[in-house]
Amino acid sequence: MKIVGAEGQEHEEFDIPFKLWRKFAAKRRLRYQSWEEGKEVMLNKLDKDLLTDFKAFAARFSSRPRPSKIFGTSSSEAISGEGNGQSGRGAARNHPRARTRCGATSTNHGGRVVPVAVAAASPRAPKKAAEAASRVRGRRRLVTRCAGAAHTQPAAIDLDGGFGHCVQKEKEAPLSQARAPAIPRGDRGQRGRKRRCGATNGGFQQPTGANQARQGR
């Protein structure tokens, strides 16, 4: 762009975008006229100090980090011409400030995602879950009775503390209430057959001819 005085005698040419001049003029509240889409600007009074300040302002503005809409700053990249023609997204992604210590960037910087350390699932996790479920079910007290005991009182088993031993408390019962030991289910038929075969000999079958030999004696 070119800046000229009101009289048209003095002029200065700058390799600075016109948008940056508009920001500088708004900050200084300068009155000017422009034409040819900002390629030429005319001031009422062309001051050397004003031009020096404008150059310093352009240098400071150009040295700022490449902004984008993600950073929430102004579009100085398009104004200053930085970024080698890259868009705001590409400039923000390649900017050093957008990178984290781990080498990646978050979703707020250029759309990249920071890798989050996720704890690996333990192979013992299903087993622990099953144990927890068994403890919940074990809180219901289970009543058992051991077969073969004369008279036992059912004991409550509490599995909250883990797998323990079954402890049964025996109490003395009157003789009239005493019962015979429980017979396993599979031996009931066998005992009946033994009685029928040899009821006179204590329930055991004698060899063939044993009774005849005893009577002969």
UniProtKB/Swiss-Prot annotation:
It comes from the Viruses. Its main location: host cell. Residues 68-110, 170-217 are annotated as: Disordered. Induction: Expressed abundantly in the late phase of the viral replicative cycle. Residues 202-217 have a biased composition (Polar residues). The keyword Ligase does not apply. GO terms for cellular component: host cell nucleolus; host cell nucleoplasm. Keywords: Host nucleus, Late protein. The keyword Transmembrane does not apply. It is found in: Host nucleus, Host nucleoplasm; Host nucleus, Host nucleolus. Might play a role in viral replication since it is associated with viral replication centers. Seems to have an effect on DBP localization. This is U exon protein. The lineage of its organism: Viruses, Varidnaviria, Bamfordvirae, Preplasmiviricota, Tectiliviricetes.
